[in-house]
Amino acid sequence: MAAAKDGCGLETAAGNGRRLHLGIPEAVFVEDVDSFMKQPGNETADTVLKKLDEQYQKYKFMELNLAQKKRRLKGQIPEIKQTLEILKYMQKKKESTNSMETRFLLADNLYCKASVPPTDKVCLWLGANVMLEYDIDEAQALLEKNLSTATKNLDSLEEDLDFLRDQFTTTEVNMARVYNWDVKRRNKDDSTKNKA
């Protein structure tokens, strides 16, 4: 199946408009356990259960990674919003000749008082120990773009986590169906041995 990237950098399946979920493999529901167990590679219930358990563990690992990304984004979004509010305040004050009194964070629970003269330049931390100077308007545009991207990514992560939960459920149901099939088969074998 061919895939194309949409405007957010998210992959959509060609033709049906469905979004692929970050390369998460879709768990296929086992309708007919008898025919499924006759397929090559499914010789015993134990091997099938082992494969399904491996798939389940992979889904759990993916969930852990997505949850970490979600936590990080949920922390970044309020920071970006707060910085945007500060920039808007500085935009209003840049025409004034009065200095702006503020407190800034030096370390956890340690603030320092400062007097900031009117300015049209700000420095933004971009990450990886990189700070760049921007005009207030440029900084505001950059942060608004970053906020939009972070919000879209958070929505995408929510969808991927929902999709992943569906895969958990499907895999768990498949494991239960294969296990029950094996129990029935063994009971049937035991009853035929007892009759003989």
Swiss-Prot record:
Residues modified as N-acetylalanine: A2
Keyword Nucleus: yes
CDD domains noted in UniProt: Prefoldin_3
Compartments in which it is found: Cytoplasm; Nucleus
Primary location group: cytoplasm
InterPro entries: PFD3, Prefoldin, Prefoldin_subunit_alpha
Pfam families: Prefoldin
A GO CC annotation given for this chain: cytosol
Coiled-coil spans in chain: none
Molecular functions per Gene Ontology: amyloid-beta binding; unfolded protein binding
UniProt keywords, alphabetically: Acetylation, Chaperone, Cytoplasm, Nucleus
GO terms classed as biological process: negative regulation of amyloid fibril formation; protein folding
Keyword Oxidoreductase appears in the UniProt entry: no
Family: Belongs to the prefoldin subunit alpha family.
Subunit structure: Heterohexamer of two PFD-alpha type and four PFD-beta type subunits. Binds to the C-terminal part of VHL.
UniProt protein name: Prefoldin subunit 3
Organism: Mus musculus
